[in-house]
Each structure stands twice: as C-alpha cells, then as structure tokens.
C-alpha cells in the first residue's frame, strides 16, 4: 500500500477514496511511487473542481470516481491541473450514445444524421464519455477514451479549434506538423495495404491532424512500445510536450531478466 503523506492533514476531501485500488490497473502499472502520489494529488484536485454527472441510470461509486479522475490527470501529470481548465462537467453515459451530427458536403448542402459516439469534447463545454469504453481504457492496449478526449482539450488551448498542434513554442510548430502529417501518411499507407481492421494503429488517426494527435496520445500513454519505434521523431516531440516518457517507465519496470508484462516490438 502506498503511504499518502498528506492524509493526516486533511489536504483534500477525496482522500478517503480507494486510491490504491484505483491505481491497480494496467495503464497505470508502470508509474513510480512518487508519480503515483503526485497523480493522486492531481486527481483529488480534479474531483474538487469538476462535477461527474451520470446519465441514463448509470451510477457512480468511489472507485469509479477515483479511476476516472486518475485517467483525466495522467496526461497533465507534469503539465499541471490548470491545463484541464475550460470545462466543469464530465457527462457519463452507461454505453456509447446517439447524437445528431450536422455536416456540409462539397456542394454546400447541409446534412443531418444520427450517429453513435463513444465520447465528445467541446472547447468551452463538458466532456461526454461512456462507461463501457472507460472500462476498456484501463488496459495497456492503445485505446483510452479519456486520454483521447483530454488530448482534444489540450489541443484547443492553442486556438479556437483542435488542429493537432498543442500549445508548444512557435519555433517547434513546423517540425511538429511535418512529423504528425508523416505519421498520418504512414498510417494511411498501412490501411490501404491491410485494411482498417488489421491496421496496427487505430485507423481514426489518419482522418485529420486533430484526431491523429488524440489517437497517438492514447498510444503514448497506454502502448508506448507501439508508438515509439514506429514514429521516433514524433515520439520525442510528444515526450517534450507531455514532459513524460512512458516507454522509459515501461523499461524500468522490467524484471532483472529483461522480461516484462508488456513485450516491446
């Protein structure tokens, strides 16, 4: 059990939550004890600042609250909780939900259709999630709905809309865009060769730069062994932006014989 040094001084109202149990999921398994402690502090502040709203009969409990907060704060572990400013509510459906989607075709005609969504993120509005996909985000598989939507929020801090380029120094923007588009082209080439379902990276990453940043952020934190060797230049840019190196964590967690619960490819 982790010793939480601030428990005795009543630093947060959520310290009674089952943090040790909440941390016991594969996507968080490689965090060092000091990182776990820092993440819990951020998650406590997150739950004080944000309102989790269950919808359509879904029920929250202390463990669900804790795990949701931990995943929200993982991308900002080194950036700081203020990077999650700009929204106050997280709406949670029990399963993927149906929304009305409006879009304009090449001829200027506006179409409206009902589509199934896993999650949504609005620049000045709430983040919308569903519990089934949140549960699937606990694994170290490359899929993480919460990190995906958080990445969109981080992306929009750089302007009015998500562009795939987060708030980085201006001198680094051109290089970031070059490496991101190169990754998109590489992913699309694989899709053209083997099809979407057989692609080793989620095909959604090839749709536009904003989705590429969000999808690769999922892989950055939950499957670094797939991201880093395939796109090494972009990997380094993600490490610099997030100020974290999940692949280093993964390797440090290997046993003395060089084995790991996650096999590097």
Swiss-Prot record:
It comes from the Bacteria. Transmembrane segments: none annotated. The keyword Repressor does not apply. Its cofactor is Zn(2+). It is found in: Cytoplasm. It holds the Pfam family Peptidase_M90. GO terms for biological process: proteolysis. Interacts with Mlc. PANTHER family: MTFA PEPTIDASE (PTHR30164), PROTEIN MTFA (PTHR30164:SF2). Belongs to the MtfA family. This is Mlc titration factor A. It comes from Escherichia fergusonii. The gene is mtfA.
